[in-house]
Amino acid sequence: MIVRWDLNSYAALLAELGIRRPLLVTTPRWTRLGLEDHRLFDGVRPHVPADTVEAATAAARGCDGLVAVGGGSAIDTAKAVSVRTGLPVVCVPTTYSGAEWTPSFGVRDEQRRVKGGGGGARIAGIVYEPELTLSLPRAESGGTALNALAHCAEALYVEGRNDEADREALAGAGAIARALPRVLADGRDLEWRRALLEGAMHAGAALAGAGLGLGHAMAQALGGRFGLPHGALNAVCLPPALRFNEPVAAAALERLAQAMETDDAATRAADLARLAGFERLRELGVPEDELDAVAEAVVLRPGTRANPRRASVADVRELLGSVW
């Protein structure tokens, strides 16, 4: 995979990869980036509904590559199409989601209100351009950055952790903890936007190298059921997941706290979430009477199985209730 900084390097990257007839996979917001010569699919929707993947796959006929411009939903849509078509993907992320680093993706079944997963996408390149994040709304900046922080935290203690992922996770957590308050205070500060994007890059690499844990499993189950923003859900779910894992992952959480320049990682994560405007699931629109069903869905997810501490349905229900 080739990584470049600066959108000016984009054309050369496509040429290097031999992509001449790309499909631009995005939302209407990003259709005016000077890529008008690309075939366009601008029907990306949150949580990647299955019918969106079908439509994007049809649009890709005759193309020799996919260019995803946007956040996790745009990138996951392109990855789902890549698996169906074999086409390579170039990602131009405009949020801090980290989706550009992994071959896996989620697709939502809207009728059943569940989100499933897949893998095997061909990620060929990434282009980071901090200026594309300047217009990102405050809530989306905070939510996607806290999603990236969750990638860092979980990479340190999940079943698939390793030394290289640890290094990426600690670098990412430190950068995010320093930069996020600055970005939330002034979203037009390009220097801190770049620092936050660098933190998200490290977080994505940590995610790719290690995998996800319980906090993400909770957010995924909630997102699939209610169609709520993935970043906001991770912001709320990460602190209780860290607390739950403290008895078995104390050393990892101490390293996380040191990277974040704090004495307590869970408290700092909750403070950052509160600063970004995320504190309670009910404030996001999650109904209390569905928490039992959500807990049952959480324990079936891969992140729960990879978590260092076994979590029962009752455990998860208690965690969800603590932040409802």
Give the positions of each predicted feature.
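Glycine-rich phosphate/pyrophosphate-binding beta-alpha loops
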Residues: G98, M201-N234, R301-R305
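A glycine/threonine-rich phosphate-anchoring loop and its flanking beta-alpha core
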Residues: A80-E164, A171-G172, V248, A252-R255
